[in-house]
Amino acid sequence: MKLPFLNKNHSTSSYSSNSSSSSWPWPSCNQNPKTLSFRATITFTNPIHDQDDDELDLLDPPEITDSVENVIKGLRSSERLIFESKGETNSILEEATSKREEEDEEEGFMLFSLESDDPYSDFKRSMEEMVEAHALHHDWKSLEKLLLQFLKVNAKTSHRYIFAAFVDLLMNLALDTKKAIINNDISKDDGVSASRAAAAGEASTSCCNSMTLGESPSSPLSFYTSCSSSSSSDETSSMSVRFLPLSSLLEMDEKTKEILV
């Protein structure tokens, strides 16, 4: 027994299956499967890490390092690259100090360094020796140059001692100059006083010698005046002695009376 609707449905279903199979664009899974198996070992690589490794290899390859060392050895052997120090040591400060000492020796004095417990006294004594050796007592320009030299060759921590010693040196020089002037004036005053005293002694001697007792030729009695000498701090004056006979005094008295009458 045949049922028509069943046949119709069957044909419809077959048609639909054929149309669907023809319209499906993707192949089915059972046709030549090419899917990789998950059991296979998969290796993932990071391109960034690969780039870093390549850069490290390029930065420090053993061949380039060896070639650089060979170049340096070749330069040394051919005397193109000379590693020599011109001074005794490699210290720049020591070379500058030695150069400064040579310049100071050319200027006429020698520089030396020492450790001092009393820098003020040492600086002052050194300055006094320089002044005495070069006769700088009244030469202000040379004294100023001396101060600048001390400041130049010493550290700033020692400048206060240098200034103090220099000021005291100037004070001592000024006092010595003043004492010399005073002594010179005193010696001059002593010479003048001695000459004045000698003159006064001679005057007093002549005065005393002139005071003699004796008879006047005109009269048995004679009148004399005593000598008087007055001395001061500036001048010494002496009065000469004059002898007048008594008769002369009487004549002078009579003439005076006539004039008055």
Swiss-Prot record:
Expression by tissue: Expressed in roots, cauline leaves, shoots, flower buds and siliques.
Coarse class of the protein's main subcellular location: nucleus
Region annotated Disordered, chain positions: 1-28
Location of this chain's protein in the cell: Nucleus
Keyword RNA-binding annotated: no
Assembly description: Interacts with BLH1 and BLH3.
Functional description taken from the UniProt entry: Transcriptional repressor that regulates multiple aspects of plant growth and development through the regulation of BEL1-LIKE (BLH) and KNOX TALE (KNAT) homeodomain transcription factors.
Annotated protein name in UniProt: Transcription repressor OFP15
Native organism: Arabidopsis thaliana
Lineage: Eukaryota, Viridiplantae, Streptophyta, Embryophyta, Tracheophyta
Name of encoding gene: OFP15
